[in-house]
Amino acid sequence: MNELIAMSAVLLSVLLQAGVPPLRSVEKGTQSQVDVQRQVTVRDATEWTSLWHAHAWDRPEPAVDFSRDMVVGVFMGSRPTAGFTVEIVGYLDAGNGVVVRYRETMPDRGALTAQILVSPYHLVAIPRRTGVVTFEKVQSTK
């Protein structure tokens, strides 16, 4: 029964995404210098440079063409062990805006994990929009 529900959710997601241009992953990882949970929308190069400096001050920011794209991202914040991740799984045009869908995963209870601080994040480029951007956390299929 759970498999049927999961398959239905995937099918619905695919149907809702039909006609929406794909997202492009700019960077994803577990070692951001942004150690608080936050979602971001970046529409110009000045904002991008500022965000990138907070996220990874020791590296140059990846190129983004803000005349046609914008960057959306999710920072999970500081977590106590390895095994935490965040992934932007898609986006939907929603009237005058965009809904960005993301999934967080965490280690299973009792799992053996490296005892290191992590700060998972995912930054993606999507076609530029002028409306409001909202973020929706979706359930893991695990």
Language-model features, listed with the residues they occupy:
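Bacterial N-terminal signal peptides
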Residues: 6-15
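Exposed, flexible binding/inhibitory loops of compact, secreted disulfide-stabilized domains
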Residues: 14-142
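N-terminal secretory signal peptides that target proteins for export/translocation
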Residues: 1-2
